[in-house]
């Protein structure tokens, strides 16, 4: 009798998917290989907003566990919590954070509110109302970010604005580009950038993996030191080649 297959759950890629979306296929292949080496056969389960179809397939497969790789559903990052919610409804075990945690942290605004409530410093910010002029209520420089989307989608050097006029221009450039393009303005703070990864350890305590620092090599004066879309995904761009990670730093 063959062992049941662990399910690799991820969002079905749309036609002409960007580099950021295609990355999930690399993740799925890497996870699948690791699980097979540990003796767990796998099956890929791409999902769409037709959650009933996904539920029927998962029910037929009856996987011993699900590796949740869903970061977006049909291009809507704000719906990412639907994946663990579906798995909860089916009573399936899965990797990663639970539904409530993903729901509360997929919105950067909700995350910042919870950080502030917990006494953790976070830069000043202002939400934006459709059709109203931006009035952050704090001095520049500013950085314009997506409320819901991750992976630096839409983020370029022009996201950093040093006055009200450039802020308004950046908002005009990015407003209305897709279903999840809600934006907010945050105080831009120049400084070093680190990547910190956490795993759940024994007794549900967080285990912090070794930190990595992003270097900004040969950035000309005035160029914002941010990890924008090009730095993350466009491997032939100067931003990509000039932002290596290092693990040995003072």
Language-model-derived ranges and their functions:
Residues 2-11, 29, 58-62, 102-193, ...:
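Active-site nucleotide/adenylate-binding loops and adjacent lid/helix of ATP-dependent enzymes
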Residues 95-97, 151-154, 240-242:
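Short small-residue beta-strand/loop micro-motif enriched in glycine and branched aliphatics
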Residues 41-43, 93, 121-124, 207:
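Conserved beta-strand segments of alpha/beta enzyme cores
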Residues 164-250:
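Phosphate-binding site of ATP-dependent enzymes
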Residues 45, 128, 161, 211, ...:
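Hydrophobic residues at beta-strand termini and immediately following loops
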Residues 70, 127, 146, 212-213:
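Short secondary-structure boundary segments
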Residues 1-93, 99-100, 104-106, 110, ...:
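ATP-binding N-terminal substructure of ATP-dependent carboxylate-amine bond-forming enzymes
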């Amino acid at each position: 009798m063959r062992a049941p297959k662990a399910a690799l759950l991820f969002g079905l890629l749309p036609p002409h998917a960007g580099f950021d979306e295609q990355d999930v296929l690399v993740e799925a292949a890497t996870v699948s290989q690791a699980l097979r080496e540990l003796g767990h056969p796998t099956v890929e389960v791409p999902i769409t907003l037709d959650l009933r179809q996904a539920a029927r397939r998962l029910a037929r497969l009856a996987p011993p566990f699900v590796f949740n790789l869903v970061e977006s559903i049909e291009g809507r990052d704000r719906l990412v919590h639907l994946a663990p919610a579906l798995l909860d409804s089916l009573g399936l075990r899965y990797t990663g954070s639970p539904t409530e945690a993903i729901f509360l942290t997929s919105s950067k605004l909700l995350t910042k509110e919870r950080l502030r409530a917990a006494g953790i410093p976070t830069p000043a910010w202002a939400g934006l109302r459709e059709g109203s002029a931006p009035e952050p209520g704090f001095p520049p420089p500013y950085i314009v970010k997506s409320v819901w989307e991750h992976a630096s989608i839409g983020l370029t050097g022009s996201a950093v604005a040093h006055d009200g006029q450039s802020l308004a221009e950046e908002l005009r450039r990015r407003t209305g580009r897709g279903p999840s393009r809600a934006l907010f303005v945050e105080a831009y703070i120049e400084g070093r950038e680190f990547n910190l990864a956490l795993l759940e350890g024994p007794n549900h305590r967080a285990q912090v993996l070794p930190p990595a620092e992003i270097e900004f090599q040969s950035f000309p004066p005035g160029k914002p030191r941010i990890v924008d879309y090009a730095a993350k995904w466009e491997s032939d761009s100067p931003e990509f080649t000039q932002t290596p990670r290092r693990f040995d730093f003072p």
